[in-house]
């Protein structure tokens, strides 16, 4: 078999095919940060701060659909640890907030609206938790993480995507957690076998930045070594930084999939890239940034580049 024939043998899994058929989907960021005016919460915020008065999940979803998007991924829990669903494993959740007198479930509202309007629903759950005292304690935190992951994957119908970033800062005890990624993946494959696992996952790789920059040729067949969660985490955002959000791809990873590169690689995989970029300077809503929303022509340029 020639080198080029070997490259042609690498094929996607059906879940990867289905994802790429979606083409375009929303990444919705909403949590306590929306009310504290922060990009990153630190886990000490009171659930009392979460008090939306006009949340309309159907409006979100119909806006997504009108833009031609076919899916929506919701930040069910960001680094602060606050859960937008009625988690039974923590008190840092909507159940202890004023929203609907503690009876609200934003994940339920958005999932139901997506289903009603024919939009695929996915979940983001940060591996970092700045509120949970178990973070940094190895298996104890992994058990907690899997417990919350199980809640999300068993109570809200079909999930098309599970999105993990590589955030791995310190917890309340000053320790970092070594994530048991393979164990997390096994749970997802068992509970939602059709879901793609993104970024710190085996199905979809990160393009390498949050500014919408990609390589001139973004190949789906790449070396197996690119699926290295430690390397992904190392290159992920570790502090709230505008500079990070605007950075371009670094020189060391400009070419991942040319024939010249792949012919010398012992193992190859189908690992398509995903571009995640915000329409605002950061990911969360801040009133003082309302005049800094990317114009339509810029968004179209990013999409087409």
Predicted segments with their positions:
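Mature catalytic domains of secreted/periplasmic carbohydrate-active enzymes
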Residues: 1-305
